[in-house]
Amino acid sequence: MRNSYDVIVIGGGHAGCEAAAAAARLGAATALVTHRFATVGAMSCNPAIGGLGKGHLVREVDALDGLMGRVADAGGIQFRMLNRRKGPAVRGPRAQADRKLYAAAMQAAIRATANLRVIEGEADTLLNEAGRVTGIRLADGRELVAGAVVITTGTFLRGLIHLGEQCWPAGRIDEAPALGLSASFEALGLALGRLKTGTPPRLDGRTIDWGAVEMQPGDDPPEPFSVLTPAITTPQIECGITRTLPATHEVIRANVHRSPMYSGQIQSSGPRYCPSIEDKIVKFGDRDGHQIFLEPEGLDDPTVYPNGISTSLPEEVQRAILATIPGLERTVMLRPGYAIEYDHVDPRELEPTLQTKRLRGLYLAGQINGTTGYEEAAAQGLVAGLNAALAAGGGEGVVFDRADGYLGVMIDDLVTRGISEPYRMFTSRAEYRLTLRADNADQRLTDKGLALGCVGTERAAFHRGKMAALAEAKALAQSLAITPNEAARHGLSLNRDGQRRSAFDLLSYPEIEWPQVRAIWPELAAVSPSIAGHVEIDAKYAVYLERQVADVAAFRRDEGLLLTDVDYAQVPGLSNEARGRLERHRPRTVGQAGRLDGITPAALGILAAYLRREARKRPAVVDGEG
C-alpha cells in the first residue's frame, strides 16, 4: 500500500469529503482516512441540507465545484425556498434528504474523484518534525507520510454519549470515539474545549397518526442547489407538523432533574439555536407549545426524524413525552434521543486558511473548530482542503474574506472571535448580505475557483455560458426604453416627467416584475427564466448594491493593511489593554483587529498611522536593482 501522499484528510463526514475532494481537484495526491467507507456521507443528525444562511454555504461550496450541492440534489426528497416572501438576500434553499440516497451519492462522488484514495482505519497520532506536520500514525501502527494533514473528526474527539443517567464513550451512536488525536493536540499546546450537541428520538412513521397533523408540501417545481443540476428527478414527499402540549411540558418538568444538562452530568455548552426540548421548557416556560417537524428519513425507510424535540432524558421519559403529542400518542420509538459531548480546538488557534498557528501543514475543519451543522462543516472542509493542497505544493494559501461569501464570514468569526457555544451560520452574521446572496454564489466565487484551479471543465463551460447570457440579457434590458406615456398604455404608472426609462430601470420598481416588461418588449421572451430572475434581482437591488460596493471597498482597504510582523510594544499610543489583546490574538490585518472585542476605533487609527510611517521608512526599490 502506498504510504506517502501530498494531503491526508482524517474523517469521512461532510467536512472531510469536501476537504479530500477539493485537495484532489487541485491535483494533490490525497488520502481520506475514515473508520469505515460505508459511513462516508452519513447524516448523523437531521436528514436535511440547507436553510437560512446554511443554504448560502451550500451554494458557495457548489460554486467552487464542491460536492454537497450536487449530492443533496441527488438525495433530496423535498425542496423548499425558505423566506420566499422576503427579499432575495435572506432567502435560504433547503432540502429534506433521503439518508441512503445522500450517502450513496456522496460515496459515488468520492469514488469518482481522481487523485483520491480512501484508507479505512483510525488515525491515532500526529507525526511532526521541526514545527511541521509530517504525517499520521494509525491505531494499527501503520504510518502515512504527507505534506499536509486536514483533521475533520466531527464529534468523535473523546466523544461521550449521554442518555439519562447513562453515559458511554462514542463518536456517534454505535461508533467508537477517537481518543489519540486529542492527546496529540494537547502535546502541541493547542487549546481544547468541550461542546455538546444532541439529537431527537427516531420514530416509526407507520405508527404516526398522519391524519392528526398538518402536512407541509415542498416547492413545485423544486429548485436544485447546484447550477449543474438541470432538474430534480427524485420523487418528492410531504413533511408533517405537530406541537407539544401543556401535558408534554408537565412530563418534562417532572423529570428535568434526570436530564444530563440539568443534573450536572454535562458541563459543556450546547447550540443556542438548536436547544433540547427540556431546555425550551425551562427557558420558555410561558409558551403553550413548541413546533415539531416530522421529517421522513427516506423514500423506502419508515424512520421519521421529529425535528424540535432533541433530548437526552431517559428512554422511558422520552416515551412518555411522545404519548402526549398529537399524532404521536401511539408511535413506536425506534431509537431514543441522546446528547454527545466532544473535544474541540479553540478556533483562534487557526489562521484564516484554517492552518494551525502552532504546527505548519496541519489544518482543521468542521465541528472540531466549534461549529455545528453539515453545511458549516462542508464549507470549512473545502477551504481547508484547498489550502492543504496549495501548501503541500509549495504555493501560497487562499483566504476567503467577509466580502467574498458566507464561508469567509464564518471563518473570520471563528478565527477572530472564537466561540463559547457551537457556531451556526445565519444571514444576520454577514455585513454585505445584499451582495452575498444564495442566488449569485457562482457569480461571486466561480471565477476565483477557476483562478485557483479547483473548478472542473463542466462547471467552467457552464459558467462561461451563463455569465455571457447574463451580460447579454442585462445589456438588452438596459437598451430598451419607454416614455411614461407609453408605459401608461401598458398599464404601468410612472412619474410623468418625460424621462425615458429602460426595461432595467422599470424592474427596479418594487411593483414591476419581469413578465410585465416582457409583455412590452417581445424580444425579452428569448431570455431564459433563470437569467431573467438574475437580471430582475440586480435591478431591484441596483441602488443599494452601489452603496455596498463602497462599503466593501473600505473593508478591503483595511484588510490590505497587514499586521503580521508588527511588534505592538513599539507602537506608541496604544493602551495596555489594546496592546495585550493584539499580542494575544495576533490579527492578520487592521480590519481583523477591528473585529476583536476591546479594540477601539482610536486604537485602529493608531495602528493605521503606525503602518503608514513604517511604510515610508522602507527604502524605495529602483527597477533593475537587486
Curated annotation (Swiss-Prot):
Cited InterPro entries: FAD/NAD-bd_sf, GIDA_C_N, MnmG, MnmG-rel, MnmG-rel_CS, MnmG_C, MnmG_C_subdom, MnmG_C_subdom_sf
SUPFAM superfamilies for this protein: FAD/NAD(P)-binding domain
GO cellular component, one term: cytosol
Subcellular locations according to the entry: Cytoplasm
Cofactors: FAD
Organism for this UniProt entry: Rhodopseudomonas palustris (strain HaA2)
Keyword Magnesium: no
Main function: NAD-binding protein involved in the addition of a carboxymethylaminomethyl (cmnm) group at the wobble position (U34) of certain tRNAs, forming tRNA-cmnm(5)s(2)U34.
Identification of the protein by name: tRNA uridine 5-carboxymethylaminomethyl modification enzyme MnmG
MF terms in GO: flavin adenine dinucleotide binding
Keyword terms: Cytoplasm, FAD, Flavoprotein, NAD, tRNA processing
Family: Belongs to the MnmG family.
BP-aspect Gene Ontology terms: tRNA methylation; tRNA wobble uridine modification
Positions contributing to NAD(+) binding: 270-284
Matching Pfam families: GIDA (PF01134), GIDA_C_1st (PF21680), SAM_GIDA_C (PF13932)
Binding, FAD: G11, G12, G13, H14, A15, G16
Subunit structure: Homodimer. Heterotetramer of two MnmE and two MnmG subunits.
